[in-house]
């Protein structure tokens, strides 16, 4: 065995083959059954000509097939590429081209989009359709059906030489431009994000066999709410499968908080992971009704959040109803994994400080002064620096040497990953996350880059200039607001802007509100004054 995702998963299968691995609606698979279907997928990929290091796109909402394809790809030492199902055609085309995707697995509902872009993607040779029960639109020429593809394949494991040096790539929406692929060594991603470091001792498991032995403990039941196209959900699946847990997948495409609480009660979920307030607030609002209906939620003891703001007021309310919970707020990014966590309990509530989460410094995180390349010490409570992770960190951004040199640096002989989050020390030695140094907007866990939205809005004939900012929002954490200078005084409506911009950007990037200004403030060089735009939008919308 190696510190490799496929090896660790197969080691768990061999130890607990009859244990339930995954639940999706009425479909339930044991570890043995999930392994068999993943083997069939791997054997099918091999027959398609997919080789070690080939890139395989997965373009789907959460489903069991997503996980089977991901695991099958790892078994072949190929690399799955996550594709955002919200993207419009131009965004899809960019990502698939940038990622050098050779084969794509897509749900039927996305057939029309695939059909419209495939001729512009010469490297993309194989199209495999996952039947999702929808009409699907246009049929992609020469497409293969997933179930038909694997039907007659062997359930036997491939004899492939795997290594901890095999690659894992996660595409992030990006905070500084177009999507970027974060390239990890497989061993590093398992240590950082897959549970390869003992949570009690803080030490790395000495062997892959010891890592897989974790599954011999009592089984935990985890519920996956975030989409697998996001790193947080993929890493939750890693932790679940490599620990022998049961992973329950929300089988609804939309988010229904009442239904989620029913799943928690039915499956006796113990570990629930969300993406900030966008999920936390509706779950909080639905909680009293769930308890009033008599749902037994006593199994739940860990409620964690990643990727977005998880407001203390929501945590406090949840704890009023479920006082035995551990609420965990994780700080991190695609380039680092977790750089810190804070734990919120009924008897030990944490207060806000400095505008962001406060957490105990882990031994793998530092705050760096990038001007001097010095490590800021905990007794320096004045200096603001960049939150950085050391040790098991990514190798690079895929095909972006310039950005890689800025993000993955060496200080005192040790490599650090610095995605751009600002932080400082508090008097008690804890760290406070102050936010991303860039102007990116985080809305419901989705990172949105203002320049991309501005360019799309300017396609409208009556938009002379504009700046896009994020303002506080109870549901989404931040919402997108456009400050617009019109070409003339004719009416300009939000729906008209959305229609014009829909050819260029996905719906979740669209402004939720617009405000007008006679002039857009910029520096003499033409650089935007986002501080002015933020203040102006807040004043117009009466946001303090």
Where do the language-model regions lie?
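Conserved AMP-binding/adenylate-forming
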Residues: 245, 301-431, 437-440, 453-454
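Structural core segment of the AMP-binding/adenylate-forming
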Residues: 47, 75-149
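Conserved AMP-binding A3 loop
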Residues: 30-32, 167-195, 199-203
């Amino acid at each position: 065995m190696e510190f490799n995702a496929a090896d660790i998963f197969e080691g768990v299968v061999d130890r607990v083959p009859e244990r339930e691995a995954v639940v999706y609606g009425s479909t339930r698979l044991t570890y043995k059954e999930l392994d068999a279907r993943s083997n069939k997928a791997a054997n099918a990929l091999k027959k398609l000509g997919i080789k070690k290091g080939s890139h395989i796109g997965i373009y789907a909402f959460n489903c069991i097939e997503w996980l089977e394809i991901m695991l099958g790809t790892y078994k072949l030492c190929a690399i799955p590429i996550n594709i955002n199902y919200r993207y419009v055609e131009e965004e899809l085309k960019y990502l698939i081209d940038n990622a050098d995707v050779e084969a794509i697995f897509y749900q039927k509902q996305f057939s029309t989009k695939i059909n419209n872009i495939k001729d512009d993607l010469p490297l993309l040779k194989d199209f495999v359709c996952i039947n999702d029960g929808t009409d699907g639109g246009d049929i992609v020429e020469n497409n293969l059906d997933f179930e038909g593809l694997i039907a007659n394949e062997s359930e036997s494991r491939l004899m492939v030489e795997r290594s901890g040096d095999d690659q894992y790539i996660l595409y992030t929406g990006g905070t500084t431009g177009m999507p970027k692929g974060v390239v990890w060594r497989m061993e590093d991603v398992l240590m950082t994000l897959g549970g390869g470091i003992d949570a009690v001792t803080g030490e790395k498991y000495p062997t892959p066999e010891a890592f897989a032995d974790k599954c011999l403990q009592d089984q935990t039941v985890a519920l996956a709410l975030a989409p697998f196209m996001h790193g947080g959900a993929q890493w939750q699946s890693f932790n679940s499968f490599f620990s022998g847990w049961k992973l329950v997948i929300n089988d609804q495409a939309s988010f229904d908080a009442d239904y989620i609480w029913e799943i928690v009660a039915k499956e006796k979920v113990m570990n629930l992971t969300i993406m900030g307030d966008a999920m936390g607030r509706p779950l909080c609002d639905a909680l009293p009704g769930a308890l009033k209906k008599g749902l037994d939620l006593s199994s739940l003891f860990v409620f964690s959040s990643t990727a977005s703001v998880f407001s203390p007021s929501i945590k406090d309310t949840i704890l009023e109803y479920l006082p035995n919970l551990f609420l965990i707020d994780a700080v991190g990014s695609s380039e680092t994994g977790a750089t810190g966590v804070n734990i919120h309990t009924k008897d030990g509530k944490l207060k806000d400080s400095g505008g962001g989460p406060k957490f105990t410094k882990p031994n793998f995180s530092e705050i760096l002064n990038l001007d001097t390349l010095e490590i800021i010490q905990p007794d320096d409570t004045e200096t603001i620096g960049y939150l950085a992770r050391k040790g098991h960190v990514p190798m690079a951004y895929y095909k972006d040497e310039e950005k890689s040199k800025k993000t993955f640096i060496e200080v005192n002989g040790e490599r650090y990953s610095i995605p751009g989050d600002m932080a400082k020390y508090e008097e008690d030695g804890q760290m406070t996350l102050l936010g991303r140094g860039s102007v990116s907007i985080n809305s419901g866990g989705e990172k949105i880059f203002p320049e991309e939205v501005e360019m799309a809005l300017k396609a409208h004939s009556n938009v002379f200039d504009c700046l896009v900012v994020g303002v506080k929002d109870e549901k989404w954490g931040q919402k997108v607001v456009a400050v617009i200078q019109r070409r003339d005084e004719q009416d300009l409506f939000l729906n008209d802007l959305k229609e014009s911009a829909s050819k260029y950007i996905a719906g979740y990037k669209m402004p939720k509100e617009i405000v007008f200004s006679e002039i857009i403030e910029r520096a003499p060089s033409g650089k935007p004054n986002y501080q002015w735009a933020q203040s102006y939008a807040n004043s117009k919308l009466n946001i303090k």
